[in-house]
């Protein structure tokens, strides 16, 4: 179908691939960075005639060029074969395809097709065919090596560029398939639900491009209007090969979707012809049109490529700036198992018209490009052809590609593990790199939306990850979409950040990619089957929601939304897509076992779902550029809008495989909310991810029963039960078709889909909700109505009620009512799977973590369930719930809802979007009429009030919900209105009766169980009965939300997990029960309405569900105990909580103003208790100074010395004889030696008045004062040495003279040495040389080495010294300083910086007199300073001893002789005066003791209050210590842990406020030895989140500010760049890893 992805070197990094080159026969030509004129995109002839011979390549705009060097020149890689005649191979090709159309499960034919393509060096198509052969049972031993060889060849070609430019001799398999399948479509057109299947549009129709397209290089222009693409190649029109994704069904308004065509090939275009000329056309907007598989497949490759070298195509697939020929859709995509060739996938993704200047090649090569240039939409939009249109244009992508992708989606999702290349399809994150391949236009246009696979994620992932779905990789293997960086709220911002910030901080590695123009919002448009991409969950009604989400959702919901006008209905989130995949029964493929997922996918599934990675799982089928469609939906803030939906998804992805983690590293991800993986953690505790033993088996049985029930329901609904669809076909179809197929049908599918189908399932589920979905997978796709038509009445689309339900569920996202009974699940065959995934968290993909697994499971719900109880557990209830009232894929809706809230810059505010959604839902409900609901059992009715899913519906009702919704009569609508009113009343009533009703409901449910002998699942939502649960769900806003919350209460964007979690379904119940308990009527249940309303009222809440099996007699009861995850208030956090709890609570916290919580807990204080009330006698006011006399070196290294010095009760310790015992050579610090070593070294000089040490007189000498004169100046060591020497000589001279005078006047006894007791009135001026820096290790090497002889705790540097963990130099603290003194030199009173300890050694020859006061009295001394008009922290003051004594403050006073070491303990207030000529050396030490740490933090906070700089960045130091030191002291551990806790809270609160405000946050990791940052204005430490401005607009000087100062400069932070130095995941990991170490026994 598509040419193999270009090898890394094949094209210029920034070169985009021209879609025109995609024409089946035309030579491949790379597109210029911008989309070429539409002509370039014109598809080759679609008729069989054109298939035989390649049409002339569409004229490329001058800019189109394949050569990396010259875009305007066609470039053929050296040695690339030129187009050759097909000879007779076309006939063989047609014959094989025709045979496969009849029966896809013919591995021999697939292998033959592969050989045909291989003979023509079309490794992409050959690989797809071989993969399909494997899917259908081909010999892996034989095909595996071939695939590996082809992939190697592709990779090589990709690097050489040969295959990229080589014209395809044989038409792409997808083209042929589509053309031949047209006949089938014509026959079954009506079934598909769209207008009768169109014949493939003639090439001319497709080729003609509006002049705009031709002229516009932008992706939008490049993409021709939907009509053009539709005509050219409607994926929907043409059947797709089994392996190919199903084209999304057109979104025509025809009321009844035509019966689904027979399932030709799994991937065949069972979807209606691509009728969405405008509406239905596959467009970036209608990402849905593309089959999930394709969507998933193409984008995934790109994404994956970036991440995994193994991927054959490291570069992003060429982006088709113009509409690629529709027929060019990924026809060759392997129908089944094998992932699509990466190249194909990449080709499959059209660049969503990328604005000029945004080159994909750039994205590939440059990180910025990957991150920012590649728009998530672009990635998602990647389709073999130009599936996505510019955001504003209708999708150009052909339906066929869509269908093909959908078909393949499943299989692609679960490529055979053994198949080489499976690795390629790894994660959306990987895809991102691939998406880089897309033409710039693709990226640009798609930026708003992710590729189907990444569609949802793309929102979160502005960068590449979102754009192309990762190549199909084993479902389990495929990592979920990029995690953290995909966060919903930040998604959009993230995307923008990626571009803007990258440009700002990383520089645009390529021409900046203009943000893709927002796709026109289509209110009514439920994208074509974008099921794959739940991303599109957003409704058209939620334009604020990023377009990307809409696209996904439209794809997934295309079927369900098709008929319903509910543009508002959001498309199911990725999780749903996954589900949809699951529903289709499919034989386990090598990659996926029916029981594959041990729930592994579940965890991944949720995460992947957001990025549409679920779809990606689909054997690399190309994703629709569905994300573009979302973009269309929200043109205003495509980037931002998308961000939010992906946010939830991205969150889910966080837990996803590391691959995703890589993505977060991107700049764009900077914007993501805390890390992706973490978010998952934050969202869901591991315990919730584990199902009880034996649950997997139970779930299998439930799946089977659900499948049967679904089939029955489908029949009842008037829709033929979806044929099992040959397993291969089903597998292929499952990506989208799965919706129609019971979720439970294929455990294997579930596994594969779990990961990738999460998104697909979401979409699928919506489809399933509609009766038509029961038809083969293609029909579900076909079902999707044109996005623009919100009211299409086609039967296949869900009724407005179902759509509303979906929307409600989506909005509710995380809060799903889990009907314990499986009946609800079984009620809807299709919806069931959907329901399972319906919990796609809106913004809480992250929240889904616990749920994320569940949604995944749901995505492949039942199958997955059987294989992994986890999945099935969540899936069943969700399915049921969905069926009942949330039928419209709630998940998608949830993502939609979250996106609006998440979207920061979106056109509308979150509240506005939610309000709009709520109104839309009500309208839908009214339209639909609630006839079905009314018939529902009373209990059901009550329950529906809370959650439509919970209510039991008669089989008829179930049918109606499943497919009859569209046909709801006017009376039904009236009833719905009435029901809505009832819902409101119930909601209010529930608030009052939440406590009682749950139990009553439970009792009723239990009573029912005995009556029903079939297995039944009782949903216990926090002790809520089904009724109560429903009601509570209806009123998510209720405080009772905690109970019903799981189903009803919307999960907070950050906590989407509940949506998935609630899904831990009770196993599905037999069809009979399902019908009985089927969720409310097709009309939206009150619960759904309430959910929607509640969503608008606030974020959904998380809900955890556990399935408990209860056996009694012949009955097996499954109690889905929904453990409502109580929201932790930030104030309730303690150090016992994990980082996930901290992040979650902090994100949900609402803080007014600045976050000012202390880093210290008063309860942790270790200060000694000193009785200050007792009046001390005079002798105690002069206590003896703690002293130690060292007699040997052994004494110096005794632990007792450390304990004595650091004892909080000893403010100061003098160690006598230290130099002698350690044999320190103090001569190294003598003035003479210093002058010789560096005589020109700077010395700070303090000019003072010489006075007695215990006195401090004013200038008049009449009274003592506290202020101390000490003016500052500078000189050199040599000059000060001269002054010191001369001062000494003068002193000697004066001494001699005084002696002579004494001898002459022996009677005189009043004389006193001037130096010791100068007359205050003499004002003898002296100079004190201080703060001489000896930090230069080279210059002062001998001196510093001598100090290494000291005990470890006294050394300048040691592991036990906090100052050694600062990471940078702090002069005078973690470096040595020298003081040169003359008699009278004073060191005024002070406490050391941040209350750290200090070491001072007197070098001699003179003495120093010390005064010290315990830290306990510092406040009293500070008060004295204030009274005397001197600043305690920064001023020079000399205490009046009498004042201290009068205040009952004991003062330690002693003399320090040469060789004595003084240890100043933490916080000790001290002042020193030299009594002789001497030098001193000193430095600070921060022993790791609780006392030291407490005092350091106290002073840190006090400095902030006093606007004084804390020289020691305590928060920075605390994190460094936590990462590098093992703490065994419980008190110290608690203090540090608490500090980290507060730091994380501060970061999260600050981050969330910025994200909510729409401010982009760029990630800029720290580098080695990078200093801590301080605010340029207030000198407060700025940790992690920096507010940077450029000084005077200069690029050379950047200033860091704290948030307060930055906002003072600009309230809206205009002109301020916000940088993030640590990802939330990094901090969380350090936080959780910091544990109390066992105490050492060495002592």
Curated annotation (Swiss-Prot):
Induction: By 12-O-tetradecanoylphorbol-13-acetate (TPA) in myeloid leukemia cells.
Biased composition (Basic residues): 972-989, 1004-1016
A Pfam family that the UniProt record links to this protein: KDM6_GATAL
GO molecular function terms noted in the UniProt entry: beta-catenin binding; chromatin DNA binding; histone demethylase activity; histone H3K27me2/H3K27me3 demethylase activity; metal ion binding; RNA polymerase II cis-regulatory region sequence-specific DNA binding
Main location: nucleus
Binding sites annotated in the UniProt record for Zn(2+): 1575, 1578, 1602, 1605
Catalytic reaction equation(s): N(6),N(6),N(6)-trimethyl-L-lysyl(27)-[histone H3] + 2 2-oxoglutarate + 2 O2 = N(6)-methyl-L-lysyl(27)-[histone H3] + 2 formaldehyde + 2 succinate + 2 CO2
GO cellular component, as recorded: MLL3/4 complex; nucleoplasm; nucleus
Keywords for the protein's UniProt record, in alphabetical order: Chromatin regulator, Dioxygenase, Disease variant, Inflammatory response, Intellectual disability, Iron, Isopeptide bond, Metal-binding, Nucleus, Oxidoreductase, Phosphoprotein, Ubl conjugation, Zinc
Sites where the protein binds Fe cation: 1390, 1392, 1470
Cysteine disulfide links: none
JmjC domain ranges (all copies): 1339-1502
Cellular compartment(s): Nucleus
Residue ranges, compositional bias (Acidic residues): 1296-1307
Composition skew (Low complexity), residue ranges: 63-74, 212-223, 394-412, 550-569, 740-764, 843-877
Gene3D superfamilies listed in its UniProt record: 1.20.58.1370, 2.10.110.20, Cupin (2.60.120.650)
Residues the record lists as Phosphoserine modifications: 224
Record-linked PANTHER family: LYSINE-SPECIFIC DEMETHYLASE (PTHR14017), LYSINE-SPECIFIC DEMETHYLASE 6B (PTHR14017:SF5)
UniProt family annotation: Belongs to the UTX family.
Chain's role: Histone demethylase that specifically demethylates 'Lys-27' of histone H3, thereby playing a central role in histone code. Demethylates trimethylated and dimethylated H3 'Lys-27'. Plays a central role in regulation of posterior development, by regulating HOX gene expression. Involved in inflammatory response by participating in macrophage differentiation in case of inflammation by regulating gene expression and macrophage differentiation.
Quaternary structure, from the entry: Interacts with TLE1. Component of the MLL4 complex, at least composed of KMT2B/MLL4, ASH2L, RBBP5, WDR5, and KDM6B. Interacts with TBX21, SMARCA4, SMARCC1 and SMARCC2.
Protein name: Lysine-specific demethylase 6B
Source organism of this protein record: Homo sapiens (Human)
């Amino acid at each position: 179908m598509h040419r193999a992805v270009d090898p890394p070197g094949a094209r210029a990094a920034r070169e985009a691939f021209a879609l025109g080159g995609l024409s089946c026969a035309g030579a491949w030509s790379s597109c210029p960075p911008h989309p070429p004129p539409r002509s370039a995109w014109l598809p080759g002839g679609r008729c069989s005639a054109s298939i035989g011979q390649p049409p002339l390549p569409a004229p490329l705009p001058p800019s189109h060029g394949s050569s990396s060097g010259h875009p305007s020149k066609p470039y053929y890689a050296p040695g690339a074969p030129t187009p050759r005649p097909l000879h007779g191979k076309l006939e063989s090709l047609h014959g094989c395809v025709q045979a496969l159309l009849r029966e896809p499960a013919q591995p021999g034919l697939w292998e033959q097709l592969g050989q045909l393509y291989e003979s023509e060096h079309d490794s992409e198509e050959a690989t797809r065919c071989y993969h399909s052969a494997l899917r259908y049972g081909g010999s892996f031993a034989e095909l595996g090596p071939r695939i590996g060889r082809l992939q190697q060849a592709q990779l090589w070609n990709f690097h050489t560029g040969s295959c990229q430019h080589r014209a395809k001799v044989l038409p792409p398999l997808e083209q042929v398939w589509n053309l031949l399948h047209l006949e089938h479509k014509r026959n079954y057109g009506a079934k598909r639900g769209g207008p009768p299947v169109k014949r493939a549009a003639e090439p001319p129709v497709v080729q003609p491009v509006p002049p705009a397209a031709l002229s516009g290089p932008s992706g939008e222009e490049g993409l021709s209007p939907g009509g053009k693409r539709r005509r050219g190649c409607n994926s929907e029109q043409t059947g797709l090969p089994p392996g190919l994704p199903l084209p999304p069904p057109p979104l025509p308004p025809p009321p009844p979707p035509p019966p689904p065509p027979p399932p030709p090939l799994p991937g065949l275009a069972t979807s209606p012809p691509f009728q969405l000329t405008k509406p239905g056309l596959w467009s970036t907007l209608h990402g849905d049109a593309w089959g999930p598989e394709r969507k998933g497949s193409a984008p995934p490759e790109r994404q994956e490529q970036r991440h995994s070298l193994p991927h054959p195509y490291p570069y992003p697939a060429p982006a088709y700036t113009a509409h690629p020929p529709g027929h060019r859709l990924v026809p060759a995509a392997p129908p089944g198992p094998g992932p699509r060739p990466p190249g194909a996938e990449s080709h499959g993704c059209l660049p969503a018209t990328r604005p000029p200047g945004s080159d994909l090649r750039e994205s590939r090569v440059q990180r910025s490009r990957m991150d920012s240039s590649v728009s998530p939409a672009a990635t998602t939009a990647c389709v073999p052809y130009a599936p996505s249109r510019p955001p504003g244009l209708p999708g150009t992508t052909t339906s066929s590609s869509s269908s093909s992708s959908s078909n393949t989606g499943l299989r692609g999702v679960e490529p055979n593990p053994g198949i080489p290349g499976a690795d390629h399809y790894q994660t959306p994150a990987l895809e991102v790199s691939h998406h880089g391949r897309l033409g710039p236009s693709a990226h640009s246009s798609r930026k708003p939306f992710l590729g189907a696979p990444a569609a949802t994620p793309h929102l979160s992932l502005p960068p590449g990850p979102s754009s192309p779905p990762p190549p199909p990789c084993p479902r389990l293997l495929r990592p979920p979409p990029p995690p953290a960086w995909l966060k919903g709220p930040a998604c959009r911002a993230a995307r923008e950040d990626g571009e803007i910030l990258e440009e700002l901080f990383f520089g645009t590695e390529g021409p900046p990619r203009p943000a893709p123009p927002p796709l026109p919002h289509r209110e009514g448009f439920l994208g074509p089957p974008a099921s794959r991409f739940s991303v599109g969950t957003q409704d058209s009604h939620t334009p604020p929601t990023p377009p990307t989400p809409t696209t996904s959702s439209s794809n997934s919901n295309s079927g369900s939304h098709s008929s319903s006008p509910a543009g508002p209905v959001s498309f199911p989130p990725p999780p749903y897509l996954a589900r949809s995949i699951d529903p289709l029964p499919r034989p386990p493929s090598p990659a996926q076992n029916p029981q594959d997922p041990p729930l592994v996918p579940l965890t991944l599934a949720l995460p992947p779902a957001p990025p549409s990675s679920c779809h990606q799982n689909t054997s690399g089928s190309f994703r629709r550029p569905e994300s573009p469609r979302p973009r269309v939906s929200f043109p205003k803030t495509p980037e931002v809008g998308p961000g939010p939906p992906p946010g939830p998804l991205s969150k889910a992805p966080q837990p996803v495989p590391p691959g995703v983690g890589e993505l977060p590293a991107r700049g764009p991800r900077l914007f993501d909310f805390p890390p992706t993986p973490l978010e998952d953690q934050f969202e869901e505790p591991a315990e919730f991810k584990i199902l009880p033993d034996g649950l997997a088996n139970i779930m299998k049985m439930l799946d089977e029963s659900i499948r049967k029930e679904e089939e029955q329901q489908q029949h009842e609904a008037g829709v033929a039960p979806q044929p099992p669809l040959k397993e291969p076909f089903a597998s292929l179809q499952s990506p989208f078709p799965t919706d129609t197929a019971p979720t439970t049908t294929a455990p294997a599918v579930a596994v594969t889909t779990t990961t990738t189908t999460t998104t697909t399932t979401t979409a699928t589920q919506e489809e399933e909700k509609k009766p038509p979905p029961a038809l083969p997978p293609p029909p579900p796709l076909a079902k999707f109505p044109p996005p623009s038509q919100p009211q299409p009445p086609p039967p296949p689309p869900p009724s407005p009620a179902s759509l509303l339900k979906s929307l409600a569920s989506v909005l509710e996202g995380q809060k799903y009512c889990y009907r314990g009974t499986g009946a609800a699940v079984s009620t809807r065959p299709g919806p069931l799977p959907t329901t399972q995934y319906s919990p796609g968290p809106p913004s809480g993909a992250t929240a889904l973590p616990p749920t994320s697994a569940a949604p995944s499971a749901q995505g492949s719900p039942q199958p997955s369930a059987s294989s992994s109880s986890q999945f099935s557990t969540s899936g069943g209830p969700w399915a049921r719930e969905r069926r009942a009232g949330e039928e419209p894929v709630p998940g998608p809706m949830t993502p939609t809802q979250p996106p609006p809230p998440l979207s920061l810059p979106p056109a509308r505010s979150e509240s506005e979007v939610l309000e709009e959604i709520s109104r839309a839902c009500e309208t839908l409900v009214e339209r639909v009429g609630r006839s079905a609901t009314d018939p529902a059992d009373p209990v059901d009715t009550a329950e529906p009030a809370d959650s439509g899913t919970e209510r039991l519906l008669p089989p008829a009702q179930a049918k109606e919900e499943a497919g009859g919704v569209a046909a709801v009569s006017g009376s039904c609508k009236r009833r719905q209105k009435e029901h809505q009113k009832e819902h409101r009343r119930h909601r209010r009533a529930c608030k009052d009766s939440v406590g009682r009703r749950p139990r009553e409901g439970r009792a009723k449910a239990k009573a029912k169980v005995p009556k029903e002998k079939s297995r039944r699942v009782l949903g216990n939502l926090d002790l809520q009965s089904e009724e109560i649960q429903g009601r509570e769900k209806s009123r998510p806003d209720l405080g009772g939300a905690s109970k019903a919350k799981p189903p009803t209460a919307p999960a907070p964007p950050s906590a989407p997990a509940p949506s998935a979690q609630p899904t831990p379904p009770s196993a599905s119940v037999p069809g009979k029960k399902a019908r009985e308990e089927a969720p409310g009527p097709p009309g939206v249940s009150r619960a759904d309405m309430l959910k929607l309303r509640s969503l608008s009222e606030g974020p959904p809440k998380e809900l955890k569900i556990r399935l408990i099996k209860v056996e009694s007699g012949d009955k097996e009861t499954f109690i889905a105990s929904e453990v409502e995850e109580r929201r932790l208030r930030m104030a309730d956090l303690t150090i016992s909580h994990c980082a996930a709890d901290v992040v979650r609570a902090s994100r949900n916290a609402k803080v007014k103003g600045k976050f000012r919580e202390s880093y210290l807990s008063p309860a942790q204080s270790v200060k000694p208790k000193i009785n200050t009330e007792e009046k001390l006698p005079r002798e105690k006011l002069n206590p003896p100074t703690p002293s130690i006399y060292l007699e040997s070196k052994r004494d110096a290294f005794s632990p007792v010395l450390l304990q004595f010095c650091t004892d909080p009760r000893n403010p100061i310790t003098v160690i006598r004889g230290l130099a002698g015992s350690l044999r320190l050579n103090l001569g190294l610090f003598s003035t003479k030696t210093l002058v010789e070593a560096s005589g020109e070294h700077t010395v700070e000089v303090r000019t003072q008045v010489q006075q007695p040490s215990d006195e401090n007189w004013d200038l008049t000498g009449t009274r003592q004062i506290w202020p101390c004169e000490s003016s500052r100046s500078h000189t050199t060591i040599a000059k000060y040495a001269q002054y010191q020497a001369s001062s000494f000589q003068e002193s000697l001279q004066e001494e001699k003279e005084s002696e002579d005078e004494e001898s002459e006047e022996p009677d005189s006894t009043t004389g006193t040495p001037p130096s010791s007791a100068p007359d205050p009135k003499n004002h003898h001026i002296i100079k004190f040389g201080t703060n001489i820096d000896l930090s230069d290790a080279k210059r002062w090497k001998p001196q510093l080495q001598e100090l290494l002889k000291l005990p470890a705790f006294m050394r300048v540097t040691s592991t036990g010294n906090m100052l050694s963990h600062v990471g940078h130099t702090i002069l005078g603290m973690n470096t040595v300083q020298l003081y040169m003194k003359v008699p009278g030199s004073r060191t005024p009173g002070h406490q050391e910086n941040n209350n750290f300890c200090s070491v001072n050694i007197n070098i001699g020859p003179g003495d120093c007199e010390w005064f010290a006061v315990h830290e306990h009295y510092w406040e009293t001394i500070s008060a004295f300073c204030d009274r005397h008009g001197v600043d305690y922290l920064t001023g020079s003051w000399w205490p009046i001893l009498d004042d201290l004594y009068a205040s009952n403050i004991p003062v330690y006073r002693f003399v320090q002789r040469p060789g004595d070491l003084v240890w100043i303990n933490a916080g000790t207030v001290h002042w020193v005066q030299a009594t002789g000529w001497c030098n001193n050396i000193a430095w600070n030490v921060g022993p790791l003791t609780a006392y030291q740490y407490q005092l350091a933090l106290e002073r840190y906070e006090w400095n902030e209050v006093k606007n004084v700089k804390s020289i020691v960045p305590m928060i920075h130091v605390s994190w460094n210590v936590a990462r590098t030191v093992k703490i065994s002291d419980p008190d110290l551990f608690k203090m540090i842990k608490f500090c980290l806790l507060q730091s994380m809270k501060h970061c999260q609160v600050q981050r969330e406020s910025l994200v909510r405000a729409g401010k982009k946050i760029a990630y800029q990791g720290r580098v080695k030895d990078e200093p801590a940052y301080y605010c340029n204005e207030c000198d407060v430490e700025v940790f992690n989140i920096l507010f940077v401005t450029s000084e005077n607009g200069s690029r050379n000087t950047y200033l860091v500010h704290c948030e307060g100062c930055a906002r003072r400069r600009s309230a809206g932070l205009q002109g301020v760049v916000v940088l993030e130095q640590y990802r939330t995941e990094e901090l969380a990991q350090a936080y959780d890893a910091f544990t109390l170490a066992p105490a050492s026994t060495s002592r």
